[in-house]
Each structure stands twice: as structure tokens, then as C-alpha cells.
């Protein structure tokens, strides 16, 4: 089971065991990556998009053999009293034969060794001749040095390298891709379930696809909730990156349009955002026709945080499981205001105390649900990025009972009928 983030996995962590299923491993996509790097850096949105793109996949393929080069001159190899000459043309031909193979790059290097070794034995007619030709072995190492995945990615990326590099999450997925190109397939599973699949980059989807060589994969997602910089906009692209296709029968796409979680009065308003998400998707309809339409509480900028705290107390009076979705810049003020009314802002959904209130930004709340949701400054979420309509859609559809807005400005006109 591959979830979008650690908070989500903690949220659903007890679901399968409660059903008697204890053999399923629950991971984030990042957990699947090998070999590991120490992730301490953070990319900006444009860099995340670039590093997660198919362009980077192509650049990695090119870089994986860029260090392989034929010698400048013919190679003379002394063996005992004799000297054998391997012409540059011969070496180049063997090199191209080895490179043309389909094995991982470091194993194709062994193919080059086999071609040269066979020719040397033909010339000298002795089985131990390879051991007596250290100059030849050194020359082959010079032509085709062994490359390690972390070093390959370090050389490919801009910025300070080596020990000075601050690796990021996107870099870790590139290292996993490099490992596949150089070393070969990683550990695998019999079946993989991927939730929130639309948020994964092209490079991350490749990482997930390799974990099921037989392409036994179930993916779930909503393109209208694709909120990451390198996320997906077409299911056909997702399938292709996983190594499957609906066109050739190796995959089947089922559109689920009946909702059981979000009440119709909330979902109908959220669906007004779909034309502005930039993706092709079908609006869902809820079987829960009863419910309350979203409510708006206006507040000045100066009173915004205090109004949020008051609204949370009001919603919690009937719905203890209440969460806040807000722009991250407002977190400190909201936390302080919650403290004033005797509540505590937390960034988790497990092991909650009676007075704890989860507070998240829209991207982090993906996959979670609350009986009551308080969305702060929806206009700021909507206008904050090109993904704003999708982020606001995510925020609104976390509510399974009531949705309240607290805002210093009117709701985005896109939410009006």
C-alpha cells in the first residue's frame, strides 16, 4: 500500500489490521527508493517539476552511459614475450555491441569484458591468458568504469556536489531511477495499491511501477486533486509510466462518480471549481442528499486568527473531529489564537488529545477527512498558485459533515452559482 505521505499512513494505519489483514506493508513512495540519500534540502516548485519530469528520465538514460568511451589509440597488451594489438576500431566495435544490450549498464560492462577476453584467448590459445594481461584489464576499466547511482545523479544535477550537496526528495527518486539503470530491478511485491496516484511525478511513478514487474497494480486518484508541482493531468500518462496501457488491454480505467463521504450540499459547491482545475475530470455526485451548505464567516485581517479559533470552538461543539485548512503563513497566528481559547494546534491526526486541533495546509491534508472542516482564507488558497483551484477543492472535500469558511475577503467568484 503506497500512500501520499506519512500523516495519511498513520491515519489509515489501523484500518487493515482491524480487518484481520496484517501482511500488507504500508509505505510512502519515498520509502521504496534505494539506495538511500540523506534528504536535508527542499526544492522550489519549479525545480520539483523539472526533477520529476520525463525530461529528467531521458537525461538519466543518456547520463548512464556517458562515462563509457573508447580509447584514443590502439591498445598494445604485453603478455609474456609477446605483445598483442587491439585496434581502436576493434575496441569501438566491442564497446558498441556491449552498449546495445538490454541489461543494466554495470552488467553490460561484463559483456564487454567477455567479448575482449574471448578474442584474447583465441589469439593466445591459453585459458589463463586473462590473468596474465593486467594492462588489458586496466584499459577496459578506463574505457568503462563502474558507475554508482548516487554519483551519477550527483554529477547530473547542478549546484554543489559531493558532501556539500543537500539532497531533496526529488533527488532521492532520481537516485532510485539511476539504480535501476545501472544495477537492475529492486525488491518487488506481488501487488501494489497506490492511493492519490495523481500526485506522483513521472520519476516517482517509474519507481512504483518497478516494484511490481508483473504490473499487478491498483491505482486510485482524482485528477482534480493533483496538487503537486510534478503531478499528473492524464490517466493515460500515469498508466504509461507504470508500464501499462488501457489501449492494449494491460490496464483498465474505471471512473467512479458516486460519492458516499462528502454530503451533497458541500460536494455540489466544491464541484464548481472543476472547470478551473486545468484537468479533464467528471464531477462526482453524492448519495448523501441531506446536509448543510458551507457557511462563511467574514473577519478583518486583524481579527482573522481569533475568528478562526471561535469558529473551531463552535464547530467542535457538535463535531469533535474538526480540522483546520489554512495557508501556511497563518499557522503561527492560528496556533496562538487556539491557545487563547484553550485548544492546541497539532500537525497530526493520530493520538489526539481532547483539546488537540489538526491544522494543515491544503496539500498536506490530502487523503484525510474530518467531521468538521474550517477553511481559512479560501481566496488565498485559490489565488496562491496555478494549482489553486485543485488545492481548494481538496480542502473543501475533507469535510464529511460540515464545512465553514473564515475569510478576510469574499469567497472566490468561481464558487458562486
Label the model's feature ranges.
Residues 4-48, 177-191, 198-417:
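Conserved helicase motor core of SF1/SF2 NTP-dependent helicases
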Residues 1-193, 198-207, 215, 224, ...:
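Alpha-helical nucleic-acid-binding subdomain
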